[in-house]
């Protein structure tokens, strides 16, 4: 058989790389120097793995290999097809074949090639100055272990666990894992299952972000600290990287071979617990025609108790994938990992705070941690604690770090101003006039002042930055010393631990305290930078994520909420009873007296057209969320047919539009803090009210995909013209309410009416109300005109005239808008388009002889 066919895939790839290097270097023959250069250039090669294990820098070795290549004879006419293998390389391959046979391998692997040629002159020339050859051989053999190369992909699977796994116990030993707080019950349950005789494989089930992986890291920390039962002491906890295991498996059977090698390695070691995160991925992984999936490879070892495995997945994926394989399911014992409470999440945040501070080089206040736990729980409803709270802290700290490392805003503004003045000065110097020369002198003075200010700010910025840099260096040093002390204690070197704890650490802490004191003194005089993450920083991040204005979360809302009635009355005229009813519900919510699981408020607005039902909803959105876009308006005339009702929650599976989601559910998922306006609700199909029952009662609605959408931070408003004739006809308030209730019973079921917080009746508008609305509408027009630089005024007589023209007791305020268009806006538009008025002019609208006329005051 051809020797080339006996090479492993890695050895073949090395030869190909060596051929490319020979071609690039204009060498006619592929030599051993090319082979060693190719191996050193490949980060994944067994040679580099061995060098990394020996802590040897490969840069110098690579340079040495290049210099050996440079010594080889060169040719100007080298073609790829003309390349040949040198005698030395051919001899080296034969030696490697002999070493492979002696070792029981069926194919020649890279490690056997290296071991066979340790005494070869080129190897000695490159490696001997920097590498202990005997130690190097030992390292290569330790990487191989007991494995035999039985296929061409065999050396891809050497030291499988180190390639495809992460040693969590080693990370715990190095103190690089975050502390695990408040998960004692789950860790104890996991240890209890692990020491059972059978079915001793725990599987952690919980929502994304509740801390399943952290529970496993907690076990690794306990193993290192010897705080586990005797049978679990000296165990190694290895996290299997499924993506690395699958990635690059080009040939059929290669994935199975890799996994089988991992299982065999775990069996041989005898003291390894395997952790598979997202364990549902093993069901079906690698399966194709004529091959097994990962689950079937693991089952026999799990059944015999040869493989200790901890799994972790979400409840949804466990049900969807894992439970389908009953044989696999029965080999695992479930442990539920529940979402921690706000107080538990706060304890977790306090535990990981030092690591976050060290990473970002900022201080994190305790108030920020409290804000992160509370605000994330209240405002980020589609994710889970503690993950969402940690994300808030992390992002706020990253934002602050970016500000520290970037140029301060004040300095940027001054630099920009200087640049603008320099450009202006250049332009003025090109046209010499007395005015220009005077302006140039002014610019020179201003530039002088600005440059002084710039230098002062730059000095201040550098001084502040240097303090931060020194604090960061000291924190890193302190962290390193604490780790060193911990390792010394574990290895029993108490003299070294005492020297660090009572000698070095106090010195470093004193330096840190001095720097903090220096920073506090600098803060008293005012600083450009800040180094503390505060509750305001956290609220800013929540504001960006959820769209809730920052001041709503942090300022005391008492005064604002107490003034809700006067605020609504500015835009909604003549509806005092309606405003009071809405204000009462919102005050109950803000005082924390209502049911937190239900919407903030749910109202049915009744009244004739044009009395302000929709306007009230818009004003409420503006008041509560500082944004009129927080109003989700659903026109119920679009849901008159039974088949259209499903659009609210999404089409059922198999129907067109299933992937798009529901009109209502998707809108609230994207903007959980909204006012939902169901306009003209009496036109909707009765099935719509069955959907609304769930929203009004539980504050939740499940869409067609089974996802629960939270409505607890919404205000539900339904408008209707039902009984508007009775509202217009009956003057007595009590009689009107009675008549309206009777009319409602004819349209809506009692269970729907019972779930509403209030039925609000809007009164018909009188002439006095219409006059007030003229003022509101005209203010809006005057504001738009002022943006164009035009002042507009309207006399009191003109206002009353427009109110009279636009008053209609049947149609409410809508005809008034048309009257204002005709009498004021149309005339103003003509004046602007005819260029009769310009920026800075004033236009007065007044009543003269029963008609509105205009008077223009030029600037």
Swiss-Prot record:
Name the principal localization, coarsely classed.
cytoplasm
* Location of region: NBD1: 159-339
What Pfam family is a match, any one? AAA_lid_9
Please tell me where ATP 1 binds in this chain: 206-213
Q: Which residues form a coiled coil?
A: 390-524
Every copy of the Clp R domain together lies at 4-146
Protein name as it appears in the record: Chaperone protein ClpB
Gene name as annotated = clpB
